Structures are given as C-alpha cells and as structure tokens.
Amino acid sequence: MAAAPQAPGRGSLRKTRPLVVKTSLNNPYIIRWSALESEDMHFILQTLEDRLKAIGLQKIEDKKKKNKTPFLKKESREKCSIAVDISENLKEKKTDAKQQVSGWTPAHVRKQLAIGVNEVTRALERRELLLVLVCKSVKPAMITSHLIQLSLSRSVPACQVPRLSERIAPVIGLKCVLALAFKKNTTDFVDEVRAIIPRVPSLSVPWLQDRIEDSGENLETEPLESQDRELLDTSFEDLSKPKRKLADGRQASVTLQPLKIKKLIPNPNKIRKPPKSKKATPK
C-alpha cells in the first residue's frame, strides 16, 4: 500500500522575538571625583571621628522591634505558667528602665547633618549645605556621580573620601554612610567645616567652569564665639558664593564637543507602506 502523501511543510506558528531598539548618545566628557591626598584623607576622617565621639551623636534602635517574636497560638500560650509570665514582666520593666529611647541622640545635632545619598541630594537641591563628603566604596559609582554636577552648580565644596563609611558608620551607630553633608545652620561642626574645606580638591565639569574656588583662603581667623549668629550666617553665605575670575564683559569660552552616534539601527517593527501608484485618468 502506497504511503499517504504528506502535506507540505509549514512555517512555525511561534513568532520571532522583535528586536528591541534603543537610541543612546555617547557622552564625550568623563566626569569623575577629584583625587584626595592621603594626608588630607586621614585629617578629615580623624577630625570627624573625634568630633562625633565628643558630641555623642548616635542612632539607637529599639531591640524589641528588632527581636520581635512571632505570634504564638492559643494552645501554646495556655501551656505557659503564670509564674513564668510574672517573671518575664518584671524583667521587661527593668530592661525598659535601662534602655534609652530609640532614635537619634542628641536630636538637634542630627538636624544639622544630611546623611545618605537621597538626603544629601534633596538638601543640595534646596541649597541647604556647606560641605559634602562621599564615600569612595560606593558600588556602582553612578550612585553618587550625580552629586558632582549638583554640588558644583550649587557652589558647594564636595569630595570623595576613602574609608568614610568604614570609620564614621560605627561611631554613629549605622551600618554604612555613603554620603555625609553639613547644613548651613550647623553650630556644632563650625570649626570642623572651616578646617576641612581648604583641603577639599576642586571639581572639574567642562560646562560649569569657574563655579567654585578654594574656599579656605579668605576664611576669617577670628574666634566664632565672639561673632553673632547673623555674622556666622553671612560668613557661610559668602563661603558658598561662587568667585569668578573672569573680568567684566568677558564670557567663559566653553568648547562643546560634538556627540557621536554609536550605531544606527532601522526599526524592524515599523510598518512601511508601499508608495501609492498614480491611477491613469481616462481621457
């Protein structure tokens, strides 16, 4: 018996995955943090560590919330004896009396600082900061790379400090400190800010030239205790103002490099209509 003829092979019903096309532009500029000298790094870390220990700034977490036991069933709770419950209640009262209130202590010192990348970013946008310090151990580096342009546009000294999180986080009771900044209303870190700013290297962004200079050259040497609060605020405002080297009437000559297109890929999902042919008109 002859074999039945087979149907011609058909194409697969499974559709091919469309090619994802993304347009990207190459940035001709390389923006990076300026290198900090080893001597300045040790000075900044030691100064901050000593001051934070002297003030006693620390975050205290509630151990009850951290070591909270799961909800017990009714049967297991009924088996517990009354004597054990009474002894546990007495122990809890004693420990509660010894434990401190959870949160930052002292609270007024915490309000003078911005801790964390998000908090530092928001404070920079509101122009509330005097000095920004970023840890070098951040991975990936783009987590803090936006602070370079933002700090320079706000005329705030900023630098990347190696081992910042390793040295400062245990002192204030945190696991890590990726960014630390000092606000303009600070009163407990005035001397430290004045001592650190001259050691901060200047940032370089091609389209933000001459935005900030060495802020430590023109600092007043008078003791801050003899100055009023108004003079302190004005001195910090003058410290944060940009100082331009350009003379009157001259403008900064910034040469912008052209953007280079990496690759042009036609969109395969685009439906291309065939050109309409002109119909012959009857004579």
UniProtKB/Swiss-Prot annotation:
* The keyword tRNA processing is assigned to this record: yes
Q: Which controlled-vocabulary keywords does the entry list? A: Acetylation, Nucleus, Phosphoprotein, RNA-binding, rRNA processing, tRNA processing
Q: Which residues carry this modification: N-acetylalanine?
A: 2
Q: Give the matching Pfam families.
A: Ribosomal_L7Ae (PF01248)
Give any Gene Ontology cellular component.
Answer: nucleolus
Output the Gene3D superfamilies linked to this UniProt entry. Answer: 3.30.1330.30
SUPFAM superfamilies, alphabetized: L30e-like
Q: Which residues carry this modification: Phosphoserine?
A: 12, 226, 235
GO terms for MF: ribonuclease P activity; ribonuclease P RNA binding
The record's annotation in InterPro entries points to: Ribosomal_eL30-like_sf, Ribosomal_eL8/eL30/eS12/Gad45, Rpp38
- What compartments host this protein? Nucleus, Nucleolus
The disulfides recorded in the entry are none
Q: Name one GO biological process term.
A: tRNA 5'-leader removal
Q: Which domain of life is it from?
A: Eukaryota
Miscellaneous comment: Autoantibodies against RPP38 are found in sera from scleroderma patients.
Q: Which family does it belong to?
A: Belongs to the eukaryotic ribosomal protein eL8 family.
Q: What does this protein do?
A: Component of ribonuclease P, a ribonucleoprotein complex that generates mature tRNA molecules by cleaving their 5'-ends. Also a component of the MRP ribonuclease complex, which cleaves pre-rRNA sequences.
**What assembly does the database describe for this protein?**
Component of nuclear RNase P and RNase MRP ribonucleoproteins. RNase P consists of a catalytic RNA moiety and about 10 protein subunits; POP1, POP4, POP5, POP7, RPP14, RPP21, RPP25, RPP30, RPP38 and RPP40. Within the RNase P complex, POP1, POP7 and RPP25 form the 'finger' subcomplex, POP5, RPP14, RPP40 and homodimeric RPP30 form the 'palm' subcomplex, and RPP21, POP4 and RPP38 form the 'wrist' subcomplex. All subunits of the RNase P complex interact with the catalytic RNA. Several subunits of RNase P are also part of the RNase MRP complex.
> What is the recorded name of this protein?
Ribonuclease P protein subunit p38
